[in-house]
């Protein structure tokens, strides 16, 4: 089998998508020696694999650090089976993922659904200090007044963490309603 088929078969045969990570640590341990090539392959091919999502969460952001930006792409559609595991892994990456989040918000302006899922899947799980680092980016998102809900989510996160004053929240909210 090609290396690609090998990784796919190993994922399918080793990981049980019905079980939590804790329930299958021994099986997941078989991936402890995963190669960088295989990680790249995971990133490029396996967004539709629930097992891959479980593996990402198990491997954790430290091991996946050079490829975090690739796994951020799994959040372009939260209905993809691996998106949940990717978002939980990336939430824990904290500071490490902020430059990549910022890049997507600034450079990929037309993919507001992706912005929406990044906010919901990662940013809202950050602590206040990390969210404060993204304050300007979030305000910029609010001001874009998109139709996909990213602006509303950005405002909700700013408000919920008291990063902008109630007056500012109110003013932005009125702007969004207009």
Where are these regions (language model features)?
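Amphipathic alpha-helical scaffolding segments comprising HEAT/armadillo-like alpha-solenoid repeats
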Residues: 2-12, 32-43, 61-74, 95-106, ...
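Alpha-solenoid helical repeat architecture
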Residues: 15-19, 41-46, 75-79, 90, ...
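Structural detector for internal amphipathic alpha-helices that build alpha-solenoid repeat scaffolds
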Residues: 21-31, 49-62, 73, 81-93, ...
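Hydrophobic secondary-structure block in the mid-to-C-terminal portion of proteins
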Residues: 145-178
């Amino acid at each position: 089998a090609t290396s690609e088929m090998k990784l796919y078969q190993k994922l399918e045969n080793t990981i049980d998508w019905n079980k939590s990570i804790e329930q299958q640590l021994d099986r997941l341990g078989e991936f402890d020696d995963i190669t960088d090539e295989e990680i790249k392959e995971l990133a490029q091919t396996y967004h539709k694999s629930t097992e891959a999502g479980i593996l990402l969460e198990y491997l954790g952001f430290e091991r996946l650090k050079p490829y975090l930006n690739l796994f951020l792409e799994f959040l372009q559609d939260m209905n993809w089976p691996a998106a949940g595991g990717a978002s939980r892994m990336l939430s824990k990456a904290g500071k490490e993922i902020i430059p990549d989040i910022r890049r997507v918000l600034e450079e990929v302006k037309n993919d507001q659904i992706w912005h929406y899922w990044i906010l919901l899947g990662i940013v809202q799980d950050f602590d206040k200090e990390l969210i404060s680092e993204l304050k300007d980016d979030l305000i910029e998102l609010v001001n874009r007044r998109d139709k996909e809900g990213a602006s509303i989510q950005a405002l909700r996160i700013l408000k919920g963490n008291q990063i902008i004053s109630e007056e500012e929240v109110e003013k932005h909210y009125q702007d969004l309603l207009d």
